[in-house]
A protein has these predicted regions:
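A charged, amphipathic alpha-helical module
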Residues: 40, 44, 48-168, 172-182, ...
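Trp/Phe/Arg-rich N-terminal binding region typifying the photolyase-homology
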Residues: 1-58, 174-175, 179-248
Length: 248
C-alpha cells in the first residue's frame, strides 16, 4: 500500500464490488535485509492467491521468458539515464518520466511493443548523443524534478524548457527500480522481484526513511550535474508533504 490513493482504491473495490482481494504488503524499510524474507513470502502468498482464484498453476517458464524481455527493457532505460548524465542529454521533459512510469507498470515483459519502442528510441538517442546534438535550442540550466509529479499537467517540463531553457534531465519518478531479475532460479527471481516492487513508483523515494528522498536528491544532482531543482508541492502524498519542512 504505497499511498492513501492505493488504500482507498483497494477498500472501494473490496467493499462495493465484493471482489476477492489479496493485500500485498510491501516492506517500508526496504533497505534493511531483515525485511526481505517477509517480502518474498508476500509474493508467494500472492501467487497462491492467484492460483486459487484461477485454478491455474504458476508457469515459471513463461515468467522467466517475460523477465528476460523486462531485463532488456531495463537495460535500455539505464542507457537513457547514462546519456542524460553527460553534457549531451537526449531525453528531457515529461517524455522521460511518463514513459518510464507507465511502461514499468504495463509491460511486465509481456507486450512486444515496448521493447520495439525502446530499440527505436534508443537508436535515435544514441545517434544524437554521438553527434553531440543538443536536445533543445538552449540549455541554461540542468534541472532535477523532485517529489511526486502531477500526471494531470504533463507539459510543465516542456514549458520550462521552451520558455526558460530549463532542461529536466532527471525526474524522481523516472529513477525507480533498476533491478535485473534472475531468470534461472525461482527463489532468486522472487527475491529480485520483491526488491524491485519495493523500489517502484511512489515507493523508492517516498518510503524507507527521509534519506531515500532528501539525501538521494543531492546524489542525483551530482550524478546529473544539475544546478537547479524543481520541487513539486505534492499535498496528496503524506510522505512528501511531511518532508516539506525538512527540505526547506
Amino acid at each position: 500500500m504505497p499511498c492513501d490513493g492505493s488504500v482507498a482504491t483497494t477498500a472501494y473495490q473490496d467493499r462495493y464490488f465484493n471482489l476477492p482481494t489479496y493485500y500485498y504488503g510491501v516492506p517500508i524499510r526496504y533497505n534493511e535485509d531483515a525485511v526481505q524474507n517477509y517480502a518474498v513470502e508476500e509474493l508467494r502468498g500472492l501467487i497462491r492467491f492467484i492460483e486459487e482464484q484461477t485454478g491455474e498453476t504458476f508457469d515459471w517458464d513463461a515468467f522467466f521468458k517475460a523477465m528476460k524481455v523486462y531485463n532488456r527493457e531495463t537495460e535500455y532505460e539505464l542507457q537513457k539515464w547514462e546519456v542524460n548524465r553527460t553534457p549531451y542529454p537526449q531525453m528531457t521533459g515529461e517524455t522521460f518520466w511518463i514513459y518510464r512510469m507507465f511502461f514499468y507498470h504495463l509491460s511486465g515483459g509481456m507486450d512486444p511493443h515496448f521493447l520495439d519502442t525502446d530499440r527505436r528510441v534508443n537508436r535515435i538517442m544514441m545517434r544524437g548523443y554521438q553527434q553531440k546534438k543538443p536536445c533543445a535550442p538552449a540549455m541554461r540550466h540542468r534541472c532535477v524534478e523532485w517529489s511526486c509529479p502531477a500526471n494531470f499537467y504533463p507539459d510543465f517540463s516542456v514549458w520550462a524548457e521552451n520558455c526558460w531553457g530549463i532542461n529536466v534531465v532527471a525526474s524522481m519518478e523516472s529513477l525507480i527500480s533498476d533491478i535485473i531479475i534472475n531468470t534461472e532460479d525461482p527463489d532468486r527471481a522472487l527475491a529480485d522481484l520483491a526488491r524491485s516492487y519495493q523500489r517502484t513508483t511512489m515507493r523508492k523515494h517516498t518510503k524507507g526513511g527521509y534519506a531515500n528522498v532528501l539525501d538521494e536528491l543531492w546524489v542525483v544532482c551530482k550524478q546529473y550535474n544539475a544546478d537547479m531543482v524543481l520541487m513539486y508541492d505534492q499535498i496528496s502524498c503524506k510522505g512528501m508533504d511531511g518532508l516539506r519542512g525538512v527540505f526547506e
